[in-house]
From Swiss-Prot:
Gene, per the UniProt record: AWAT2
GO biological process, one term: lipid metabolic process
Enzyme class: transferase
Entry's EC annotation: 2.3.1.75, 2.3.1.76, 2.3.1.20
UniProt name for this protein: Acyl-CoA wax alcohol acyltransferase 2
Length: 333
């Protein structure tokens, strides 16, 4: 009987690490609902479900109050396999002083923000060594915190809810050395997540600038080269039935339903896992922001423009290192 080689075993662990995170929301949600329905309908153990719901109500605001991270979870060896699968690489252009707080603004979102999760919700890329004295708080959809056990898993990585109250708390109640991480394009940017794309949803998104001004914290641009190369999408005929449905659905729930595909459990198979393609994230220079309690729209627009200029500069300085043409520019929509 032939045993798998060390290389084959490592490859299998890399694939499993990506699979378990990519589908954890679906698996945990399905399991929690099924088990609790069974307890309530078919057993006398319905009080267990009541206790779970009571805890959920009691703990409801924790994701908006700094979350509940577990350092040991962030250091799981599983995340190293997750990072090696692509692989992921995190680079900085400037040192970050831990005597201040920051808002790190990430681009592009991609379909599942794999790079951002690996870099900032785990220690697989060596965040604490690259940015000593800085505590990262990656912000994500509030829906991830609605389901018992899933919310615990997500919060254990240091993730918090992406809401105004959450950002206010992190920037005012946690001392200094905190980095609030927002992937500003959100799910609306998924429709532009195509290999080679450099299109960002940013033109009308200035709330993060207003928050930075109100707290007087620097904005840091970050760009993940390769994030949009992790999946392919089928593009439906513009104006056709499916395309109209996609746009209608996005207008209703702010999520663009994509017909995406990647690889399967083996390298050359078809499936819904991301392709094993490198993602390198460049963290730029902090952009200083004055503290203005109630900034006018003109002031917000001014610093929004300055931020976009800094992001373009970061992109242009590094794009050719990652196979992007010298003539290709960021498209801000």
């Amino acid at each position: 009987m032939l045993l798998p080689s060390k290389k084959d075993l490592k490859t299998a662990l890399d694939v499993f690490a990506v699979f378990q995170w990519s589908f954890s929301a679906l698996l945990i949600t399905t399991t929690v609902i099924a088990v609790n329905l069974y307890l309530v309908v078919f057993t006398p153990y319905w009080p267990v479900t009541v206790l779970i719901l009571t805890w959920l109500a009691f703990d409801w605001k924790t994701p908006q109050r700094g979350g509940r991270r577990f350092t040991c979870v962030r250091h799981w060896r599983l995340w190293k396999h997750y990072s090696d699968y692509f692989p992921l690489k995190l680079l900085k252009t400037h040192d970050i002083c831990p005597s201040r707080n920051y808002i790190l603004v990430c681009h592009p979102h991609g379909l599942f923000a794999h790079g951002w999760f690996g870099h900032f919700a785990t220690e697989a890329s060596g965040f604490s060594k690259i940015f000593p004295g800085i505590t990262p708080y990656i912000l994500t959809l509030g829906a991830f915190f609605w389901m018992p056990f899933l919310r615990e898993y997500v919060m254990s990585t240091g993730a918090c809810s992406v809401s105004r109250s959450s950002i206010d708390f992190l920037l005012t109640h946690k001392g200094t050395g905190n980095m609030v991480i927002v992937v500003i394009g959100g799910l609306a940017e998924c429709r532009y997540s195509l290999p080679g794309s450099s299109t960002l949803v940013l033109k009308n998104r200035s709330g993060f600038v207003r928050m930075a001004l109100q707290h007087g914290v620097p904005l840091i641009p970050a760009y993940a080269f390769g994030e949009t190369d992790l999946y392919d999408q089928h593009i439906f005929t513009p104006g056709g039935f499916v395309n109209r449905f996609q746009k209608w659905f996005q207008s209703m729930v702010h999520i663009y339903p994509c017909a995406f595909y990647g690889r399967g459990f083996t390298k050359n198979s078809w499936g819904l896992l991301p392709y094993s393609r490198p993602v390198t994230t460049i963290v730029g220079e902090p952009l200083p922001m004055p503290k203005i309690e109630n900034p006018s729209q003109e002031i917000v627009a001014k610093y929004h423009t300055l931020y976009i200029d800094a992001l373009r500069k970061l992109f242009d300085q590094h794009k050719t290192k990652f196979g992007i043409s010298e003539t290709q520019e960021l498209e801000i929509i």
